[in-house]
Amino acid sequence: MTADDYGRTLPFFTVNLLVSDLARSIAFYTNVIGATLTYSDPDFAALRLRELEFMLHADHTYDHHPWFQSLTSGVRRGLGAELRLFHTDPDALEARARKHGATILQECKDMPHGWRDVIVADPDGYTWAIGSATKPIT
């Protein structure tokens, strides 16, 4: 599929993360988060996680963008945004994160908002909260 054909297939909402090492990020998202890689080249990767289609772009693809200097300065990325996955076993995800050496920001625990979650960071510092309901919704 060409890039412009792919762009026309995107849903109403999707996520695009700019990453410093595309291969390392693909490994994190497939091995730890459980996404399926649907396409990749040296600049770009498309992944699917259930209904979510999301993208990774290598930093160098933004070399003419106003963000480029900030991207390559080593500043932590994604600060202030938390991506959440619900209906996902947080204990199993934490085990995969440990197995693959991923950064665990918060170990699994039951939260006051009604779900058990784990919080992990991808290799570039993007934060993911993954969990499931602690009891059935009534």
Regions found by a protein language model. Give the residues of each.
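Vicinal oxygen chelate
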Residues: M1-N16, T36-T88, A92-A121, S132-T138
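N-terminal first-folded block
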Residues: L18, A23-T38
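Conserved active-site tyrosine of GNAT-family acetyltransferases
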Residues: S25-T30, A97, D122-G125
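Short glycine-/small-residue motifs
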Residues: T127-I130
